């Protein structure tokens, strides 16, 4: 019974990734229609990546459930070790292309804390239909004590390094903390902005329209390391401003799709991709499935 419940939730995480890549059109991003601003990946690359990651999603939630009473830092270390194996498997499946590195990190933490939370809330294990937004908040709060050390541990000693990873370079150049920053703050962009906005949208619109509007909203607020890496601070600010204007127009679904298709070409021309917004889109979908919003 327990394994079946945990499996069903890990499948919601996989489903969230499938929904994210399938949502179309997404400016600058890989979707069903085209590869956005990416020359090295396609819709099928994402499918390969998801299949590779899927067993690890199961491992994350089972680890959280099994070690729910463990010290937060010890649980974090277990999840990170699993996450590193998952990352290696992903890169093998995609021939070295980074499809889900940051999202895998976030999913490891959130599935791990979902498992730990469920171990402490047996009523949800017997009836997931009772899962509420309060449970979402509680799960995200569990991440913070696991990750409070991350910025100092991972990014605090970069002055001694000569070569940087993509995430480290963003921190050194711009102070952008990326997925580590989101995690160390308990995913507040997700809990305080993305999910409240989506709950409102889904109560007023059909699912596809709600998802497209959520994407636009996220592109208007997220500190997007992907955009900054590709185009710099000004390009990122420009995308945010454009998306704020698009939100204010309150377009019909048909006109919104047309506007996003047009903007897709703009971002392709500039080689810009809002990957940070895409990751938060998938994380929002995960909790939307748990809360039965979708």
Swiss-Prot record:
MF-aspect GO terms: ATP binding; triphosphoribosyl-dephospho-CoA synthase activity
Keyword ATP-binding in annotation: yes
UniProt keyword terms in alphabetical order: ATP-binding, Nucleotide-binding, Transferase
Any Pfam family the entry gives: CitG
EC number per UniProt: 2.4.2.52
Stated name of the protein: Probable 2-(5''-triphosphoribosyl)-3'-dephosphocoenzyme-A synthase
NCBIfam families registered for this protein in UniProt: citrate_citG (TIGR03125)
Keyword Protein biosynthesis: no
GO annotation, biological process: prosthetic group biosynthetic process
Family the entry assigns: Belongs to the CitG/MdcB family.
UniProt-listed InterPro entries: CitG (IPR002736), TriPribosyl-deP-CoA_syn_CitG (IPR017551)
Catalytically driven reaction(s): 3'-dephospho-CoA + ATP = 2'-(5''-triphospho-alpha-D-ribosyl)-3'-dephospho-CoA + adenine
């Amino acid at each position: 019974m327990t394994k079946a419940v945990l499996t069903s939730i890990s499948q919601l995480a996989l489903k969230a990734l499938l929904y994210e890549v399938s949502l179309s059109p997404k400016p600058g991003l890989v979707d069903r229609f085209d590869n956005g601003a990416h020359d090295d990946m396609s819709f099928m690359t994402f499918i390969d990546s998801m299949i590779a990651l899927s067993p690890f999603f199961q491992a994350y939630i089972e680890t959280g459930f099994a070690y729910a009473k463990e010290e937060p830092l010890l649980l974090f270390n277990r999840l990170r070790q699993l996450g590193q194996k998952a990352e290696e498997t992903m890169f093998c499946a995609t021939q070295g292309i980074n499809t889900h590195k940051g999202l895998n990190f976030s999913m490891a933490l959130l599935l791990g804390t979902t498992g730990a939370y469920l171990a402490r809330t047996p009523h949800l294990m017997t009836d997931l239909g009772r899962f509420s937004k309060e449970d979402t908040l509680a799960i995200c709060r569990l991440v913070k004590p696991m990750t409070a050390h991350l910025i100092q541990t991972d990014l605090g000693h970069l002055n001694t390094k000569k070569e940087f990873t993509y995430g480290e370079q963003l921190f050194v150049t711009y102070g952008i903390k990326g997925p580590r920053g989101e995690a160390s703050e308990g995913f507040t962009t997700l809990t305080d902005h993305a999910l409240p906005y989506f709950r409102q949208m889904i109560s007023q619109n059909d699912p596809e329209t709600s998802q497209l509007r959520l994407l636009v909203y996220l592109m208007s607020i997220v500190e997007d390391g992907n955009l900054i890496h590709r185009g710099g601070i000004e390009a990122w600010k420009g995308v945010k401003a454009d998306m704020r204007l698009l939100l204010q127009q309150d377009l019909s679904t048909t006109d919104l799709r047309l506007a996003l298709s047009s903007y897709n070409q703009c971002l392709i021309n500039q080689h810009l991709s809002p990957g940070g917004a895409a990751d938060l889109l998938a994380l929002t979908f995960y909790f939307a499935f748990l809360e039965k919003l979708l």
